[in-house]
């Protein structure tokens, strides 16, 4: 079963990330075997409306880097992109992050649900 310890790990990851966009994210918890995840997946529901997102046009490097899916270098690259001559403080489309060498397609897919543009 899950038990108190593993339940606490799930809650901790959910809190740190700002919610889950996929039940498959539970596989990121090292101390919970895939066999247990496979058993509980049918009972898990995900509420995308409750995801906590970060506005990339108004967040500092420190705030961006606070998210576990964003490295310091990625946070700095987002900030620098926002303030380059073309953007003048405003990124218009999240997909622009794919033009940064700091973001692989995989990195972007993992983090995009936690980012927003206001």
For the regions a protein language model found, what residue spans apply to each?
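Compositionally biased linear targeting/interaction segments
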Residues: 1-118
């Amino acid at each position: 079963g899950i038990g108190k310890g593993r339940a606490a790990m799930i809650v901790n990851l959910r809190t740190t990330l700002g919610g889950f966009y996929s039940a498959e994210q539970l596989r990121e918890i090292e101390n919970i075997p895939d066999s247990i995840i496979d058993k509980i997946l049918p009972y898990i529901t995900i509420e995308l409306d409750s995801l906590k997102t970060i506005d990339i046009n108004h967040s500092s490097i420190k705030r961006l880097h606070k998210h576990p899916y964003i490295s310091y270098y990625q946070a700095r690259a987002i900030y620098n992109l926002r303030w380059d001559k073309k953007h003048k403080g405003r990124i218009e489309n999240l997909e622009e992050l794919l033009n940064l060498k700091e973001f692989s397609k995989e990195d972007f897919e993992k983090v995009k649900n936690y980012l927003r543009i206001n």
